[in-house]
């Protein structure tokens, strides 16, 4: 027998439930009505612990509230077990009040409530002293009630929720089941003291169970381990010495890329806007709205360079009350606009108007966010922009209007932006993966063959890979820190793999793949299995109330 003595239990009327988990990772349930002939049988009902958490207390007052569901944790699990410390918890508002299992459509809970005050026991009403209530509720209505004396359950030790037939166990005993199978959507224990409560969330796996006279005496889990793969494929746990071919369909969960270059530089496009003097521009005729706009340039997303080289022949005019530039919302000059500034929107226009008030009034009347004034010693042909000065003549100047909002869609630059992407070759070994090797994609089982790579002639992909007859990659090379490393791409499924059984135990695997840690054996490789997953026998009693982990 490959895996001796996982459990030995006799079930009289219920599913068996593991109550105290210890450090183990599995529990096995099956119905007492499941009485197959003697021998090995593939059967559901094994649950693997995938998450463990604890909770000290969740009652904020001096006591918890009995006869009600006050605390719940959300799950999406095949099974959830909630266990108290080994001594259990008292049926008292000073310690334990309510535990429940939520199967989405209905809730099963256990509680106590010996109180007659108004508002007490909202779900159950008064429960007799020294009794507990096991109930099921759907759409706020109770459809199942069972009152039990505490002599049967002196303390609360565990409540377990199982999707199979929506089974619920109190202290290891089946106390509720239905003809539906639903995952656990929520569960919880409302308590004040006596904890902590341990929550163990589980997923369902198949199991191969060995029955004698209707009793499961041994269990091998179909969990992807070597023992599980062999036993569940051959539907038995008894193997004589020899070689046993097997198949294992690989589920691809990982991807990796092998790059030709350790880094790649990408130069992003830089859009240039070049402005020039408008020699035949007409002066305004009074007011800022008569200032004509020229060479309007609006930036979209990306990188931009604004070329104002023609301004070298103009004289910048500082802001002086009504005179000159006006750009308090722009903390830059046009000479520095390309210094890596960020904008959400940006538009630039040229205009010719009075240096006296032209900029300030343009900003006040929302023609621009900022305005920069430049003198070219122009004639006094521009009209005023203030009421009472609309017919007066003033010196004409160049006005540069900037309309902008701050953000990160647009960046100004003096030079094109170069983005450097650093590539790291993290190669996943000894499992089936999706790969992209030098641009060639596929699925494979990657092994390191550096120690065996001698005098390979690399032809494809710049001398970096050998291709097989189909054009797929067979062997590829990667530059490592200490030299070249060679890797072989094998099919995910090895049709030649065999388990090796010796002395009735699974001791190794023969494979055609050179996996990490394998030993060459003629034209194959041998992988030694050092420790099989061995479990010791569980105790036997005439009336099983719980099946603790060993």
Swiss-Prot record:
Instruction: Fetch the InterPro entries from UniProt.
Output: CoV_S1_C
Name assigned to this protein: Spike glycoprotein
One of the GO BP terms on file: virion attachment to host cell
Q: Which domain of life is it from?
A: Viruses
Looking at the UniProt record, the site noted as Cleavage sits at 538-539
User: Which residues are on the Extracellular side of the membrane?
Assistant: 19-550
Assembly description: Homotrimer; each monomer consists of a S1 and a S2 subunit. The resulting peplomers protrude from the virus surface as spikes.
Function as written in the Swiss-Prot or TrEMBL entry: S1 attaches the virion to the cell membrane by interacting with cell receptors, initiating the infection. S2 is a class I viral fusion protein. Under the current model, the protein has at least 3 conformational states: pre-fusion native state, pre-hairpin intermediate state, and post-fusion hairpin state. During viral and target cell membrane fusion, the coiled coil regions (heptad repeats) assume a trimer-of-hairpins structure, positioning the fusion peptide in close proximity to the C-terminal region of the ectodomain. The formation of this structure appears to drive apposition and subsequent fusion of viral and target cell membranes.
- In the UniProt record, which residues carry a glycan? 23, 74, 102, 139, 145, 164, 179, 213, 238, 248, 265, 272, 277, 307, 426, 448, 514, 531, 543
Which family does the record claim for this protein?
Belongs to the coronaviruses spike protein family.
Q: Where is the signal peptide?
A: 1-18
Q: Which keywords annotate this record?
A: Cleavage on pair of basic residues, Coiled coil, Fusion of virus membrane with host endosomal membrane, Fusion of virus membrane with host membrane, Glycoprotein, Host membrane, Host-virus interaction, Membrane, Signal, Viral attachment to host cell, Viral envelope protein, Viral penetration into host cytoplasm, Virion, Virulence, Virus endocytosis by host, Virus entry into host cell
* PTM (free text): Specific enzymatic cleavages in vivo yield mature proteins. The precursor is processed into S1 and S2 by host cell furin or furin-like protease to yield the mature S1 and S2 proteins. The cleavage site between S1 and S2 requires the optimal sequence [KR]-X-[KR]-R. Cleavage is not necessary for virus-cell fusion.
One GO cellular component assignment for this chain's record is:
virion membrane
Would the keyword Repeat turn up in this protein's UniProt record? Answer: no
Q: Does the keyword Zinc apply?
A: no
């Amino acid at each position: 027998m490959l895996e001796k003595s996982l459990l030995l239990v006799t079930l009289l009327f219920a599913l068996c439930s593991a109550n105290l988990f210890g450090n183990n990772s599995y529990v096995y349930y099956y119905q007492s009505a499941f009485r197959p002939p003697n021998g090995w049988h593939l059967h559901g009902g094994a649950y693997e612990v995938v998450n463990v958490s604890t909770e000290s207390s969740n009652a904020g007052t001096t006591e918890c509230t009995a006869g009600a569901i006050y605390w719940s944790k959300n799950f999406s699990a095949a099974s959830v077990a909630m266990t108290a410390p080994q001594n259990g918890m008292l049926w008292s508002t000073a310690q334990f009040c309510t535990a429940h299992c939520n199967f989405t459509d209905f809730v099963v809970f256990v509680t106590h409530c010996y109180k007659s005050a108004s508002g007490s026991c909202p779900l159950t009403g008064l429960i007799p002293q020294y009794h507990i209530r096991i109930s099921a509720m759907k759409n706020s209505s109770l459809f199942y009630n069972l009152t039990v004396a505490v002599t049967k359950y002196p303390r609360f030790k565990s409540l377990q929720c199982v999707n199979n037939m929506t089974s619920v166990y109190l202290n290891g005993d089946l106390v509720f089941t239905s003809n539906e199978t639903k995952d656990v959507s929520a569960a919880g224990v409302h308590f004040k003291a006596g904890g902590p409560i341990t929550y163990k969330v589980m997923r369902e796996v198949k199991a191969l169970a060995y029955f004698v006279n209707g009793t499961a005496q041994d269990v091998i889990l179909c969990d992807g381990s070597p023992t599980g793969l062999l036993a569940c494929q051959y539907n038995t746990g008894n193997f004589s010495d020899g070689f046993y071919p097997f198949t294992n369909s690989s589920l691809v969960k990982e991807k990796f890329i092998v790059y030709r270059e350790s880094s790649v530089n990408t130069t992003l496009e830089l859009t240039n806007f070049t402005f020039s003097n408008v020699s035949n521009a007409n002066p305004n005729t009074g007011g800022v709205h008569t200032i004509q706009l020229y060479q309007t340039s609006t930036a979209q997303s990306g990188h931009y360079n604004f070329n104002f080289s023609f301004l070298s022949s103009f004289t910048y005019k500082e802001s002086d009350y009504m005179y000159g530039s006006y750009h308090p919302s722009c903390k830059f000059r046009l000479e520095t606009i390309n210094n890596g500034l960020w904008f959400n929107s940006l538009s630039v226009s040229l205009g010719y108007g009075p240096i006296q008030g032209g900029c300030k009034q343009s900003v006040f009347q929302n023609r621009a966010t900022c305005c920069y004034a430049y003198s070219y010693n122009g004639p006094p042909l521009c009209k005023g922009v203030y009421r009472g000065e609309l017919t007066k003549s003033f010196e004409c100047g160049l006005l540069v209007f900037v309309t902008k909002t701050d953000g990160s869609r647009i960046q100004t630059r003096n030079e094109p932006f170069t983005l450097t992407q650093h590539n790291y070759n993290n190669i996943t070994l000894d499992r089936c993966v999706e790969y992209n090797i030098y641009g060639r994609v596929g699925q494979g089982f990657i092994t390191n063959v550096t120690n065996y790579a001698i005098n390979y002639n690399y032809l494809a992909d710049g001398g970096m890979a050998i291709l097989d007859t189909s054009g797929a990659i067979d062997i590829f090379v990667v530059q490592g820190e200490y030299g070249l490393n060679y890797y072989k791409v094998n099919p995910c499924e090895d049709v030649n793999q065999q388990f090796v059984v010796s002395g009735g135990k699974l001791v190794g695997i023969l494979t055609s793949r050179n996996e990490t840690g394998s030993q060459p054996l003629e034209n194959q490789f041998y992988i030694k299995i050092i420790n099989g997953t061995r479990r010791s026998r569980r105790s036997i009693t005439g009336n099983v109330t719980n099946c603790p982990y060993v």
